[in-house]
Regions:
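Metal-dependent nucleic-acid phosphoesterase active-site entry motif
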Residues: 1-27
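Helix-adjacent hinge/juxtasegments
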Residues: 53, 58-84, 88
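Acidic, PIN/NYN-like endoribonuclease modules and their adjacent C-terminal/linker elements
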Residues: 107-113, 117-140
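PIN/NYN-family metal-dependent endoribonuclease catalytic core
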Residues: 11, 27-57
Length: 140
């Protein structure tokens, strides 16, 4: 990699699920994190959310598939960041999205990659850019 700086990112649940299960533009993130070009960050709360969403019946994943995705596609490449609780809600309309902002701040992320309008409408948070997957891939 030479002098190229690794890009630290927080990936919202909707994007991680799309990347792992459906490919498309979000799927372009997988080789980036596997090659070390980007370094995804996640808190325990975010990982719990990834698992919770993977268990949704609409995805038809069995326990072994969820285990595989978590232990072979996510955890080996992600840095787990310790995050404290927010002092007050940051996103009033959907405080559950605060976990992505708090993780990005604690982990000194460069970007949050999301498809969530509550996050995207912020555009940035404490100098951390918030982009959808297409915007992020085009920015590289």
């Amino acid at each position: 990699m030479g002098s190229q700086k690794v890009i630290r990112v927080v990936i919202d649940t909707n994007v991680i699920i799309s990347a792992l299960l459906f490919g498309g533009i979000p799927g372009q993130l997988i080789p980036l994190w596997k090659s070390g070009h980007i370094k995804p960050l996640a808190s325990a709360e975010i990982i719990d959310e990834y698992i919770r969403v993977m268990t949704y019946p609409k995805f038809k994943l069995i326990e072994e598939e969820i285990h595989y995705l978590l232990h072979f596609e996510i955890l080996p490449y992600f840095i787990v960041v310790s995050v404290g609780p927010p002092l007050s809600p940051i996103i009033q309309k959907d405080p559950s999205d605060d976990m992505f902002l708090l993780c990005a701040e604690a982990g000194k992320a460069n970007f949050i990659i999301s498809g969530d309008q509550h996050l995207l409408s912020l555009k940035n948070y404490k100098q951390i850019k918030i982009l959808n997957p297409e915007q992020f891939v085009k920015s590289l």
